[in-house]
Amino acid sequence: MNNIFSKLRDFVGLNEQVEYEYYEEEADTDNYQNLYQQENPQPAPAEAAPNNRRWREPMTTMGDDVATGTKSAMGNVIGMPGAINGISEVLVLEPRTFEEMPQAIQALRERKSVVLNLTIMDPDQAQRAVDFVAGGTYALDGHQERIGESIFLFTPSCVQVSTQGGVIHEVPQPPARPARPASTNPPAWGNETNRMAQ
């Protein structure tokens, strides 16, 4: 029985002897001062030796300075593409094949609006392309609108779409928090002094 366990340990590798490598280093006596036999102490240098430590200087990005006009203390914040300069971009795509559709999704991820002109595509491929981009737009909380025959507008969630008749898609604003009124009633547990917590 013991033989089976030893074979199992050998197979798994638990019986192997661990070999440690030992290094013997000679002491570098040139860098040490002999404190006990110092008869003629050396004069202290006029200038202290520079530290070998590397200090990290605070860095600011050009985008932070441009957006706020001042240097920002939060240099590690990375903004959304196109959000710093406030310029909205619209990408017009006229794809010939379905393989060009990931470009539209990437543009939506970069907060760009996409006008998709599918007039030169095969109708079956065009339907597949619209379904693909519409699914990506939905996943990114965007909006889609049909502009004309085989022409579609896909926008990210930060773009408000409107027509002459009114707003089709409005950018949601964060709800305002209602202020909590101060309670004038004292707590019920504060009046009972003879009760003990269990």
Swiss-Prot record:
Main subcellular location: cytoplasm
Matches recorded under InterPro entries: Cell_div_SepF, Cell_div_SepF/SepF-rel, SepF-like_sf
Biased amino acid composition, Low complexity: 179-188
Key words of the record: Cell cycle, Cell division, Cytoplasm, Septation
One GO term of the biological process aspect: division septum assembly
Subcellular location: Cytoplasm
UniProt region (Disordered), positions on chain: 170-198
GO cellular component: cytoplasm
Pfam family, one: SepF
Homology family: Belongs to the SepF family.
Quaternary assembly: Homodimer. Interacts with FtsZ.
Known role: Cell division protein that is part of the divisome complex and is recruited early to the Z-ring. Probably stimulates Z-ring formation, perhaps through the cross-linking of FtsZ protofilaments. Its function overlaps with FtsA.
Name of the protein described by the UniProt record: Cell division protein SepF
Organism for this UniProt entry: Trichormus variabilis (strain ATCC 29413 / PCC 7937) (Anabaena variabilis)
